[in-house]
Amino acid sequence: MHEVVLYTRAGCHLCDQVKATLARLEKRGGLSFVWQEVDVDSDPELQQKFNHEVPVVFIDGKKAFKYRMDERDFLRALVAR
């Protein structure tokens, strides 16, 4: 099971797009991943680290995407891990 973390913040339209993509893929089923959303503004260290990079997606602890991600690219990255 792959672990996916989406670093995001309120009011970020690109974050909303990536979140919708992950939710759609999760709902579709058949993929071996779980995901969680983390608000970078909830932690000063995360805010400093990702302030200008959200959304950022990590798969199994490794940065896979920042700013944009589509279904096809996510599926490729998931299979490559």
Region annotations inferred by a language model:
Residues 59-81:
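Non-catalytic, surface beta->alpha helical segment in thiol-disulfide oxidoreductase systems
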